[in-house]
């Protein structure tokens, strides 16, 4: 019967049913073979007993029974081997069917994913990602520039002072010494005198710068 509870059996159910029938047949063949092997041993024992008693006619008849019994044992062994081969084929069919069902499910899932993954949308997402990344890079660069501008003036001034000090040290000069050589005046000055003092101070600074420049030129010529 290929119907189960009013519905048609699936291929998997039919395979399981046939597999159970084959296993049952192999068990029955094993039981019959064991009975024949037990009978074979009994016949051999009877043949030996009759031979000792000299009943050769009975021995000949029992020998024929022994031959038939051994032939049946070989047939049962062969039948069981054939049934086992069929059982293995059914098992292979079950495995192949299971693999086919699994592949069917995977194929269906792949189809669903392919339908969900729309290329234009993916391209749009990637373009938007690249745009946002560029904006982020630009903002980061602007922030770095702002930080450099805020910190750069102080660093540049310190670096410039360090360079001037190094040059003067190499020349054996001192900025403090140069400034101390400038002429200075004391006492209270009028507004006009203050103006003259400022002019004199500016002139003295200019002379000091000119003198320093002249020394640098002489060092270069040396």
Curated annotation (Swiss-Prot):
Region (Interaction with VTA1): 217-222
InterPro entries assigned to the protein according to its UniProt record, in alphabetical order: Snf7_fam (IPR005024)
An example molecular function term from Gene Ontology annotations: protein domain specific binding
Keyword Thylakoid: no
Coiled coil: 12-53, 195-222
Taxonomy, superkingdom: Eukaryota
PTM text: ISGylated in a CHMP5-dependent manner. Isgylation weakens and inhibits its interactions with VPS4A and VTA1 respectively.
Modified residues (N-acetylmethionine): 1
UniProt KW Transmembrane keyword: no
Residues modified as Phosphoserine: 184, 188, 190, 203
Annotated GO CC locations: amphisome membrane; autophagosome membrane; chromatin; cytosol; ESCRT III complex; kinetochore; kinetochore microtubule; lysosomal membrane
Location of region: Disordered: 179-198
Sequence segments annotated as region (Interaction with VPS4B): 56-222
UniProt domain comment: The acidic C-terminus and the basic N-termminus are thought to render the protein in a closed, soluble and inactive conformation through an autoinhibitory intramolecular interaction. The open and active conformation, which enables membrane binding and oligomerization, is achieved by interaction with other cellular binding partners, probably including other ESCRT components.
Protein purpose: Probable core component of the endosomal sorting required for transport complex III (ESCRT-III) which is involved in multivesicular bodies (MVBs) formation and sorting of endosomal cargo proteins into MVBs. MVBs contain intraluminal vesicles (ILVs) that are generated by invagination and scission from the limiting membrane of the endosome and mostly are delivered to lysosomes enabling degradation of membrane proteins, such as stimulated growth factor receptors, lysosomal enzymes and lipids. The MVB pathway appears to require the sequential function of ESCRT-O, -I,-II and -III complexes.
Protein family per UniProt: Belongs to the SNF7 family.
Assembly mode: Probable core component of the endosomal sorting required for transport complex III (ESCRT-III). ESCRT-III components are thought to multimerize to form a flat lattice on the perimeter membrane of the endosome. Several assembly forms of ESCRT-III may exist that interact and act sequentially. In vitro, heteromerizes with CHMP3 (but not CHMP4) to form helical tubular structures that expose membrane-interacting sites on the outside whereas VPS4B can associate on the inside of the tubule. Interacts with CHMP1B, CHMP2B, CHMP3, CHMP4A, CHMP4B, CHMP4C and CHMP5.
Protein name stated in the entry: Charged multivesicular body protein 2a
Organism: Mus musculus (Mouse)
């Amino acid at each position: 019967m290929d119907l189960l509870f009013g519905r048609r059996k699936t291929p998997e159910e039919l395979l399981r049913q046939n597999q159970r029938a084959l296993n049952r047949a192999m068990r029955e063949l094993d039981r019959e073979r064991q009975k024949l092997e037990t009978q074979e041993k009994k016949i051999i024992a009877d043949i030996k007993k009759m031979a000792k008693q000299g009943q050769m006619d009975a021995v000949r008849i029992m020998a024929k029974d022994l031959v038939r019994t051994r032939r049946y044992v070989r047939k049962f062994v062969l039948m069981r081997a054939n049934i086992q081969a069929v059982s293995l084929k059914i098992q292979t069919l079950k495995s192949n069917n299971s693999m086919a069902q699994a592949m069917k499910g995977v194929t269906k899932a792949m189809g669903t994913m392919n339908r969900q993954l729309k290329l234009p949308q993916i391209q749009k997402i990637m373009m938007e990602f690249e745009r946002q990344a560029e904006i982020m890079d630009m903002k980061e660069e602007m922030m770095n520039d702002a930080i450099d501008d805020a910190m750069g003036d102080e660093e540049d001034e310190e670096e410039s002072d360090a360079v001037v000090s190094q040059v003067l040290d190499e020349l054996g000069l001192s900025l403090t010494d140069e400034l101390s050589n400038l002429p200075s005046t004391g006492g209270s000055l009028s507004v006009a005198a203050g103006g003259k003092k400022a002019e004199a101070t500016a002139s003295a600074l200019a002379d000091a710068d000119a003198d320093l420049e002249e020394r640098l030129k002489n060092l270069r010529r040396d």
